[in-house]
Amino acid sequence: MRSDAGGIDKIGLAPGPALHQIACMLIETETTPNPATLKFLPGRTVMEMGTRDFASPEEAEASPLAEAIFSLGDVTGVFFGHNFISVTSGPGADWSSLKGDVLSVLLDHFSADMPLFRAASAAGISVPPEDSDWPSNPEDADIVAQIKERSETRVRPAVANDGGGIVYRGFDKGVVYLQMQGACSGCPSSSATLKHGIESLLKHYVPEVTEVRAA
C-alpha cells in the first residue's frame, strides 16, 4: 500500500495487510470485502469468548474502547472479534485520516491495559445467550444443534477472516436465520456470501436446511 505524507497507508490501493509499529506495539490492518470497513489486529486477544457488535454510540457506552472509536466521528459501527477489531466508517468518510485516528485510540487503550468493558456491562460482553434465540420447535432441537455446531466450526472462522461475525437467531420450517455483524453487516457482497456460501455449506451438512436468510 502507498503511504501519504503522514505515513498512513491509503486504503484500497493494493491488496494485503499493512503493518503499523507504534511505540513498540505492532498493529496490523487489513481491508475487508466491505469497502466501508477496516480490520485492525493488535497482536493480542481482544475477546476471550464470543464477539460483540456496536451499531451506535449508545451501544458503545458499554465499552471504553468502542466509545472512544465512535467519538472520532465518521464511525457507524465497531465489532470486537477474538483477535481483531473491525471499524465501519460512514458515507464519505476519509479512511486515509480516520485510520490513523483509530490506530492512536487502539494504542492508548492497549498501552494503558484498560478494560474492554465497563463493569456494569460485564454480563453483555459475549454473543447473546441461548435464550435470546427465536422460539423454535422442540422437535427441531437436534437440527438446531447441528446448525449451531457447523456455524461455529465452519462459518464463523471464515467470516472472521473478513472482519465480520454471525449470530444464529432461529430455525423455522427449513429456514435458518442468521444475523450478520461487523464487516459482513451492510457489505455489498453479504447477500452472495449468505446465499452461495453459508447456505450451500449448511444445506450440505444439514439436509433439513432449505434456505438461509438474514435476521
Give the positions of each predicted feature.
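Domain-level signature for proteins that mediate thiol-based redox and metal-cofactor handling
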Residues: 11, 17-215
